[in-house]
């Protein structure tokens, strides 16, 4: 018999129903469950697939550069970044009538185009790219790296080049390599690029391969470096009247600590950014020499962990046994990596708008909104993934004997206390926040807005004041004008910081009031509830009072029959599934808050947010309804306009989202019956009955239908909000 899909599971390949296809797709990447898998092959497969992943990333970024060079208006944008709209790529659509062609022909293009809201123009401009030729060169280089990655992936699947398991488990060497080699050397290389290409570019000096050996990045060259007079590199920075990309008002400094923003570009000083990357490079280069490898010097991570027993015995045997537990569990390592990456992605969202690093990006409001929302959603998915793999670790990899009384075992021992505390925090936040919002709603409905309960966020205001914000009048730390820190800050370190904090046109330490206080606690409710579901799912993954032998059922079982008092919806997968809804809900609140506050800031009517955000009707009416008018007007009696694509996407997003419920709120028997009826009709219909299928059609399993429903819900939810966000922002600010 010919090999049927899936080849990795002979059991599934012989399944006579359509379950074969769906289960095959679902388990294609679960290498551990494949036939004749060994630990060695498992590691080698994952390693090789990393190169494929890199190849895709390089190909994708190469495509961005290529399409902008070919169909964009980068060179025109460089001449006037604030008024030319950056083009992502052309649109060729045979359905376009004349009104559509006219609506989408913008940015000086000859035909219909898409506008770029990704910030790539600002990024490329900041790092020194100026011409289409530069973009093509970058695209070709990335294409080359993509091909190289594919070759490397193929190479490491050949018998001679397959690394051994011991190589994969050599944690110290890997850590040294990643810290020094990846983070250290790449940060140093980036500093080099900024100093040699980007900073001269910002001063009107065009540095390329033909002249980069002749153009000194600093008038004194490496003299100050070797003589130890490093402060010379910080002298004579760009002046506040510097015009970015020209020599007008420029200085000669390359590594500075100015703080604050370049007055014209509203972005961080490039010389500060170079200084930052140099510091990071030194830190990581040192960190990458700390662990013991072939040379017998440095720390052994196992020794560090074994020795780390907290005093007083309150954490039992501390970190004993953790080294082998982590080093032998891919799921534990993936969980740690995802948790770290998730936090970093969310931090990127927060910092890209509050401390913009790219020239003129702060004045491109739609891009700011798109980037913030994009990074927050990505962070949410990555963080939920961390807990999912944490749960799989407990089911597949956790060994109680190896971890007796260490911090991991004690987490499991104390899980009731952890879960109940999280539950209490979620209930407290939910009832109090909703109570305040609803009270305020009722007061407005009855025409007595003065009876609202409005709480000033005094602790948060105090923290902002401590960092230098003077408008609250707290007179503490950096906002205390006669304190030593304030006076040192004016001259020695970051003189621009205090100006930036108190400048109301940027997004650094936005002024906050009662509306912020309420939405902060609404978001805290969402975060705590999401965490509760995820933590409970992971800590109960091996077993609970109701189902002590849960680990024997694997990660994603739907139910264990009618006994035991009801064992449906309690698998670790079910917890992940529920948590994703809460994650989306929470990030919805986060992005609503960010977007509304910024729209009012950019429009200069901050009082609208302050007055309307203290009650739910304000959010529904003055944020969602008021800002959806652009979408509703995408198509109107006068024809269409450039927002119509977002109007269409808004409707399509709702359709996808609503389709999710068809899978989420429906029992399996209904679908099975429907499918059998359809199959029966098909087999008895002339012509149609000439086409037969090999697999008997069966309904999706409960878990699969939930996954399909969750995927539609998530994708539709994000599509809908993306269209709303981009249309409402670009409709106002262009």
Swiss-Prot record:
Primary localization: plastid
Residues that, per the record, bind phylloquinone: 671
Short name of any one Pfam family annotated for the protein: PsaA_PsaB
UniProt keyword Cytoplasm present: no
Compartment annotation: Plastid, Chloroplast thylakoid membrane
Origin superkingdom: Eukaryota
InterPro entries membership: PSI_PsaA/B, PSI_PsaA/B_CS, PSI_PsaA/B_sf, PSI_PsaB
A single GO BP: photosynthesis
Membrane-spanning parts: 46-69, 135-158, 175-199, 273-291, 330-353, 369-395, 417-439, 517-535, 575-596, 643-665, 707-727
Keyword match Methyltransferase: no
Sorted UniProt keywords: 4Fe-4S, Chlorophyll, Chloroplast, Chromophore, Electron transport, Iron, Iron-sulfur, Magnesium, Membrane, Metal-binding, Oxidoreductase, Photosynthesis, Photosystem I, Plastid, Thylakoid, Transmembrane, Transmembrane helix, Transport
Sequence positions that bind chlorophyll a B1: 654
PROSITE patterns associated with the record: PHOTOSYSTEM_I_PSAAB
Binding site for chlorophyll a B3: 662, 670
Cofactor binding note: P700 is a chlorophyll a/chlorophyll a' dimer, A0 is one or more chlorophyll a, A1 is one or both phylloquinones and FX is a shared 4Fe-4S iron-sulfur center.
NCBIfam families in alphabetical order: psaB
Subunit relationships: The PsaA/B heterodimer binds the P700 chlorophyll special pair and subsequent electron acceptors. PSI consists of a core antenna complex that captures photons, and an electron transfer chain that converts photonic excitation into a charge separation. The eukaryotic PSI reaction center is composed of at least 11 subunits.
Function according to Swiss-Prot or TrEMBL: PsaA and PsaB bind P700, the primary electron donor of photosystem I (PSI), as well as the electron acceptors A0, A1 and FX. PSI is a plastocyanin-ferredoxin oxidoreductase, converting photonic excitation into a charge separation, which transfers an electron from the donor P700 chlorophyll pair to the spectroscopically characterized acceptors A0, A1, FX, FA and FB in turn. Oxidized P700 is reduced on the lumenal side of the thylakoid membrane by plastocyanin.
The protein's name in its UniProt record: Photosystem I P700 chlorophyll a apoprotein A2
Gene: psaB
């Amino acid at each position: 018999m010919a090999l049927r899909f899936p080849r990795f599971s002979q059991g599934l390949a012989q399944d006579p129903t359509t379950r074969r296809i769906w289960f095959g797709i679902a388990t294609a990447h679960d290498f551990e469950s494949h036939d004749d898998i060994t630990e060695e092959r498992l590691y080698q497969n994952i390693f090789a697939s990393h190169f494929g992943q890199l190849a895709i990333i390089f190909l994708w970024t190469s495509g961005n550069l290529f399409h902008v060079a070919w169909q964009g208006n980068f060179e025109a944008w460089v001449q006037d970044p604030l008024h030319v709209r950056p083009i992502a790529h052309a649109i060729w659509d045979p359905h376009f009538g004349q009104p559509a062609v006219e609506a989408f022909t913008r940015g000086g293009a000859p035909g219909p185009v898409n506008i770029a809201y990704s910030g790539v123009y600002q990024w490329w401009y900041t790092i020194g790219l100026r011409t289409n030729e530069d973009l093509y060169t970058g695209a070709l280089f990335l294409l080359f790296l993509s091909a190289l990655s594919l070759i490397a992936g193929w190479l490491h699947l050949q018998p001679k080049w397959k690394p051994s398991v011991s190589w994969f488990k050599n944690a110290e060497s890997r850590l040294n390599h990643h810290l020094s080699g990846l983070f250290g050397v790449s940060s140093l290389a980036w500093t080099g690029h900024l100093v040699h290409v980007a900073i001269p570019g910002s001063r009107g000096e065009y540095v390329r391969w033909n002249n980069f050996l002749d153009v000194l990045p600093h008038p004194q060259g490496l003299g100050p470096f070797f003589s130890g007079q490093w402060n010379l590199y910080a002298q004579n920075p760009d002046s506040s009247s510097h015009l970015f990309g020209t020599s007008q008002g420029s200085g000669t400094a390359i590594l500075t600590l100015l703080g604050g923003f370049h007055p014209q570009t509203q972005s961080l000083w490039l010389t500060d950014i170079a200084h930052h990357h140099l510091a990071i490079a030194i830190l990581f280069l040192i960190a990458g020499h700390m662990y013991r490898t072939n040379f017998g010097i440095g720390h052994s991570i196992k020794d560090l962990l074994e020795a780390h027993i907290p005093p007083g015995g309150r954490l039992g045997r501390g970190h004993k046994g953790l080294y082998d537990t982590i080093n032998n569990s891919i799921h534990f390592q993936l969980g740690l990596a995802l948790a770290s990456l998730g936090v970093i992605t969310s931090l990127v969202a927060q910092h890209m708008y509050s401390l913009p690093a790219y020239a003129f990006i702060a004045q491109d409001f739609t891009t700011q909104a798109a980037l913030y929302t994009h990074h927050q959603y990505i962070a949410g998915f990555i963080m939920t993934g961390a807990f999912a793999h944490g749960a799989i670790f407990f089911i597949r990899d956790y060994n109680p004997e190896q971890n007796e009384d260490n911090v991991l075992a004690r987490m499991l021992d104390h899980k009731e206390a952890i879960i109940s505390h999280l539950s209490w925090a979620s209930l407290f936040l939910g009832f109090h926040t909703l109570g305040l919002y609803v009270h305020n709603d009722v007061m407005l409905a009855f025409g007595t807005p003065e009876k609202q309960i409005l709480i000033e966020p005094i602790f948060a205001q105090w923290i902002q004041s401590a960092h230098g914000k003077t408008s609250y009048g707290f007179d503490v730390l950096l906002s205390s004008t006669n304190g030593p820190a304030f006076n040192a800050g004016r001259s020695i370190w970051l003189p621009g910081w205090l100006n930036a904090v108190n400048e109301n046109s940027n997004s650094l330490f936005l002024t906050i009031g009662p509306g912020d206080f309420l939405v902060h606690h609404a978001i805290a409710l969402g975060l705590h509830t999401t965490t509760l579901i995820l933590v409970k799912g992971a800590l109960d993954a091996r077993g609970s009072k109701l189902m002590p032998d849960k680990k024997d059922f694997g990660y994603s079982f739907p139910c264990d029959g009618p006994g035991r008092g009801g064992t449906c919806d309690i698998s670790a997968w079910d917890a992940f599934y529920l948590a994703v809804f809460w994650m989306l809900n929470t990030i919805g609140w986060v992005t609503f808050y960010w977007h509304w506050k910024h729209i009012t800031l950019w429009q200069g009517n901050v009082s609208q947010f302050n007055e309307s955000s203290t009650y739910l009707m304000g959010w529904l009416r003055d944020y969602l309804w008021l800002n959806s008018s652009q979408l509703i007007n995408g198509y109107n009696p006068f024809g269409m306009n450039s927002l119509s694509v977002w109007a269409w996407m808004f409707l399509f997003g709702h359709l996808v989202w609503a389709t999710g419920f068809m899978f989420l709120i429906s029992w399996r028997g209904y679908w099975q019956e429907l499918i059998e009826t359809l199959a029966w009709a098909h087999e008895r219909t002339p012509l149609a009955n000439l086409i037969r299928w090999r697999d008997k059609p069966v309904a999706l399993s409960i878990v699969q239908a939930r996954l399909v429903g969750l995927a539609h819900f998530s994708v539709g939810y994000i599509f809908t909000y993306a269209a709303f966000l981009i249309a409402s922002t670009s409709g106002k600010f262009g």
